[in-house]
């Protein structure tokens, strides 16, 4: 069974909150991908300048609020399955799903939350 997994850039309203470095541009790739249950899926996020490890990953399903998966680039939120992992620092980051499950059909976002200017 093919699964469609979308990776899209999070809107400016979530990328730029008070005190954030909103001059930092985030680029995700791929913009979309097709994968099957059991596949290893990798989504990358690149910052236009170094953000140390100030990066979070979110999963959003239709008609649902975004769910936090990863914070500080590689720390798994409580209750998130261990098949999700994050890595990277500086400008290049990766979200990996080690074995895609049917419930992982969703849109995935990265968000930078670099320190105050």
Curated annotation (Swiss-Prot):
Region named Framework-1: 23-45
Disulfide bond sites: 45-110
InterPro entries xref list: Ig-like_dom (IPR007110), Ig-like_dom_sf (IPR036179), Ig-like_fold (IPR013783), Ig_sub (IPR003599), Ig_V-set (IPR013106), IgV_Light_Chain (IPR050150)
Keywords: Adaptive immunity, Cell membrane, Disulfide bond, Immunity, Immunoglobulin, Immunoglobulin domain, Membrane, Secreted, Signal
Region: Framework-2, residue numbers: 57-71
Top-level lineage group: Eukaryota
Domain Ig-like: 24-117
Stretch list, region Complementarity-determining-2: 72-78
Subcellular location(s) per record: Secreted; Cell membrane
Complementarity-determining-3: annotated segments: 111-117
GO molecular function, one term: antigen binding
One record GO biological process: immune response
Region (Complementarity-determining-1) location: 46-56
Main location: secreted
Signal sequence region: 1-22
Function summary: V region of the variable domain of immunoglobulin light chains that participates in the antigen recognition. Immunoglobulins, also known as antibodies, are membrane-bound or secreted glycoproteins produced by B lymphocytes. In the recognition phase of humoral immunity, the membrane-bound immunoglobulins serve as receptors which, upon binding of a specific antigen, trigger the clonal expansion and differentiation of B lymphocytes into immunoglobulins-secreting plasma cells.
Assembly mode: Immunoglobulins are composed of two identical heavy chains and two identical light chains; disulfide-linked.
PANTHER family: IMMUNOGLOBULIN LIGHT CHAIN
Descriptive protein name: Immunoglobulin kappa variable 1D-16
Gene: IGKV1D-16
């Amino acid at each position: 069974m093919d699964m469609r997994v979308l990776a899209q850039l999070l809107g400016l309203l979530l990328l730029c909150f008070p005190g954030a470095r909103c001059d930092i541009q985030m680029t995700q790739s791929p913009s979309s991908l097709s994968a099957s249950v059991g596949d290893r899926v990798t989504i990358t996020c690149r910052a236009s300048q170094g953000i140390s490890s100030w990066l979070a990953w979110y999963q959003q399903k239709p008609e649902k609020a975004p769910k936090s998966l990863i914070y500080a680039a590689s720390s798994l939120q409580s209750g998130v399955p261990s098949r999700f992992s994050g890595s990277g620092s500086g400008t290049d980051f990766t979200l990996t799903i080690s074995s895609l499950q049917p419930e992982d059909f969703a849109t995935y976002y990265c968000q930078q939350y670099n320190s105050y200017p």
